[in-house]
Amino acid sequence: MSPSALVLDFGGPVLLTPFELVAHEPGTPAHGLLHLRGPLATAEQPDPVWEDVQAGRITERAYWAARAEQWHESGGREPDIRSMIAHLYEPPRPELVREQARALVRDARAAGHPVGILTNDLRAFHSEEWIEKIEIVGDVDVVVDGSVEGHLKPAPRLYELLSERLGVCYADMVFLDDQTTNIRGAEELGIPSVWFDVGDPDTSYAEVRKLLGLPPEVPRG
């Protein structure tokens, strides 16, 4: 029996989220809009629009388009998603990628597991030059990007494309994503899935390792 494939959403499980990056930018328009919002929102500072994303009432793309417009109105540059994302993610640098994700990909590949990235927005949010300099993208076997394919998670066709290109059936994948709508879409197809908790990444990675039969991560240092 072939090892199960590891399938990672990119933004969140692999790449730090904008909500985390703005913690280092107090006093900026981006900090005012995104700090303690999204998956890091609290009862004292809720983010009802993010809750709409999780419930499937609006798309994540619509969420970021609205935030980019607000960012512009608050003193940011152009009112488009790419400009706001570039403000946070340029230049491309190693610390944008979670160390736990690096370790998971490294260990999965060493154990013979195929590894894929299944994303909605990689090329919608980032330039080709930026993508080429984020080395983990080149460490996986397959990248399926909804912004290129014309289908966005949770549309079944995107998962189908991933299955075809990895050469594995749905039951032989383990999928990690931070959007509950995408998890539901995967589970409806029979894909074993783990919701990525931005507030508790270690627990999410540990659950994926368990499903893949990988040992717990050994901290470096």
Region roles according to the model:
Residues 88, 108, 198-201:
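Short alpha-helical linear motifs
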Residues 54, 96-103, 116-120, 137, ...:
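Short, charged low-complexity intrinsically disordered segments located at boundaries
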Residues 2-103, 110:
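N-terminal helical cap/lid subdomain that shapes the substrate entry/recognition surface
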